Amino acid sequence: MYTVNPQLVVLVDRQQQLREVRYLSLYGTLDEASPLYYFAKQHLRAETLAVERRHILLTLKISQLKGYLCHLLGLREDIIIYSHKNNLEYSYVDNTIFNPFTMTQKKTLIKADSFLYNVYVDACDFLVVWVARAQDTPVPEFGSFEEVDANILKFEARLVEMFPELDLEFSIQSKFNNVFRTNLRSTGLRNIVKRNQDNRILFIKTDEFFITMSGNHFVLNNEALNLSIWDAQGRLAISSDGDTITVNDVRLFTELVTDSNLQMERIKGDITYRIFLLSPITSKIKLDIETSFIFVETATNNILLSADKKISIILAKNHISIKVKNHIPNIEKYFTFLVIFINRMFNAVQQAVDFTKIETIYWSRICQNTRDKNRKPVIVSSLDANMERVSDNFFRSPTREVFVNSNNIMFSCVDPLGKYNSVGFLAIFYKLQKMCIPCCFLRSQAHTDTFISCVHHRELDRQLVSPYVLNFGKIVTEAKISFLPILFDQFFNEGLRIEFEADHKRLKATDGYHVVKCCTRSEITRLRTQRDIIQFVNAEQNTLIAGDMVYFPMHGARSAGAEHQRVYILIQEIVHEVVMVQKAHDSDRIRFRELERNRLWEFFPYRVPSARIKEEHGLVLTTDGFYVDGKLFSEPLSTRYVAFTENVGTAGVAAKYFAPVFKYVVTEARELFIKTWLLNVMMQLGLTGESSAAQTREALERYYRLS
């Protein structure tokens, strides 16, 4: 849980004696355990602290801060603000801390209107601002008066009001991107290795002859030289190829790199924080009032910039990404706090966010207004006096209906044309994920299954499936079925019979026919990218149809038995299943049967029978893997140890032998996949770069005969 730290405003007189000490806290109470309280009592010797539920926004410019302080202290005269720790409005060329009561050389003073969090480095944790009337100092000409920005006060008032409602529970991952061009080379990296005592380290020097093995993986690296050092938490702290170095842990870097001749030229430097939220937010923020003193809007409504445009913030439903140029202690936590508050303030109606988007289906697309149709419900603040309660969440009067969702947001249909005034619910949302999403209809929806479920909380028999068969392409709910695409319909249903009613859509009877139904999973499975598809197919160990492509699992050659008979199919990025459907003439009940045989396996391009290569003392090496006492060895190996094996080319005898298989491979890194495949095969068969072409081909045909 993030705690917004208190702040101190100290007003002093001509003798620098305390006149007022304001303790600003959004919690409205003194935190006697805080460093600030200790500072006020032990160092300032303040007898009393005036506690106020106020907060100085750390994103203010110094001129805005001065206006805020004038208003806070009730001053209508020139003031000078300063700090005992940092320079604020004025600074010396040599960065000596400015104090208006102990001036040195006026000529070396620089005045700047910077942002508070930039000039006061630990403002997030320990903010103390000193204020003096200009006439009480030896340099009254340095003072000025600023009017407070009314928008800042308005924003602060809303913050104070809503602060108790904010959920500031979140976790943070950080990544430093400090990249330098260096002259370390191989000798410099070896010296770092020698100085390292406690951290896990991997130093790789490769060429075209050798490949490094670490743990269960080949280290396939295009760099001839690579040094990686991890910290105690297992995070990559330092990485270098001799020419450039990436520093994620500055402290560790300074400990290990002591070469006085080291040359470093910064190429890139920033820090990315990824904040994971306990409570979701709305990723699209529209700032409706003046907030330029905090954020700057961009053309993309889920991206914000700080007021100085040096910090970028990307919003998502469950996390926030913040990129900063320079390290400012806890600034990522402070901006997360501001984002959560602004999201809460400007998007209160988005408590109904549950229907803004569900996977690929958008509420605004399905239930949208057009020139003569007003189907999108509006949010209302109260019920009419003459409304009758239909259920605990639905109310009706002769002219209006109101639905109250689980977040107590009230929706009603108010069509200026007087047509779409009946509140109903989108069936597809409810059938896919049991979500009651309101929409406006021409006629009462009280008779529909979805209305009965959402309003009266009565679940209907979901085993009843409509005998009407949909054309392929629409998302299929649990009460529907659809045809397969024409190509696959002909393939799967060759020789099978099906009868339809006269309208050719209503299923009359069949002893077995392949159709598409929804996946029987607790949640929708959505595959957005090719990577998603590959991961899904390999995890399920089943086939997937996507467009005109059929995806087989990587290890499909090992087994195509009963457990590998499922066939999935992708419709609008949602995973569905291919099943057999049965229906008798005298019944409307549709029955489903899992596939007895997946004919797609006949086309799997790599069917190789398992063969034993070597066996000794209960250890068996096969083309399928390494077995210990009959069990496949799959234990993760330690990455603390490094071994080497001979490199392979992707154009040799083995590569040409497997070329008929490789042309079917779908991967994001084709060359690395082929090299890994060949390395595994060559190691299993004990082949080396010195093996002749005839010897290599003979071994491949013996153990990996392609059918």
Curated annotation (Swiss-Prot):
One of its GO terms (biological process) is positive regulation of DNA-templated transcription. Pfam families: Pox_VERT_large. GO terms for molecular function: DNA binding. Keywords: Activator, DNA-binding, Transcription, Transcription regulation, Virion. GO terms for cellular component: virion component. It comes from the Viruses. The keyword Nucleotide-binding does not apply. It is found in: Virion. InterPro entries: Poxvirus_early-TF_lsu (IPR007532). Heterodimer of a 70 kDa and a 82 kDa subunit. Part of the early transcription complex composed of ETF, RAP94, and the DNA-directed RNA polymerase. Acts with RNA polymerase to initiate transcription from early gene promoters. Is recruited by the RPO-associated protein of 94 kDa (RAP94) to form the early transcription complex, which also contains the core RNA polymerase. ETF heterodimer binds to early gene promoters. Belongs to the poxviridae VETF large subunit family. This is Early transcription factor 82 kDa subunit. It comes from Molluscum contagiosum virus subtype 1 (MOCV).
